């Protein structure tokens, strides 16, 4: 699922994406990919020039893989989020990619998150940012 968020009057607004051309008219601050399909990954690569590593949410999380910076200015961060289900607690890995410096790329100023399942804290952030104007000003605030 490809969730794209823009800012409108200081509030986070979700925009539905059904095809690649939908991305052309947007200036998002956050592109959240929950279990993205190959097609959705292709759209992101084609429009933003962003290559999503195949192991973005993989199990191997050596210290060097948790944070690194690409030559083009993209910062890659992998972090685990705790899910506390009724039966058990577990962690879910999320990969983040942020480019704040390279203005030559369409990805500049956009936070990309890649995850395999829904994470409650992401829902909570979206709800708060929709209701509270000015809570989020840019991709770094997400």
Regions found by a protein language model. Give the residues of each.
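Peripheral, non-transmembrane regulatory/ligand-interaction domains of membrane transport proteins
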Residues: 1-142
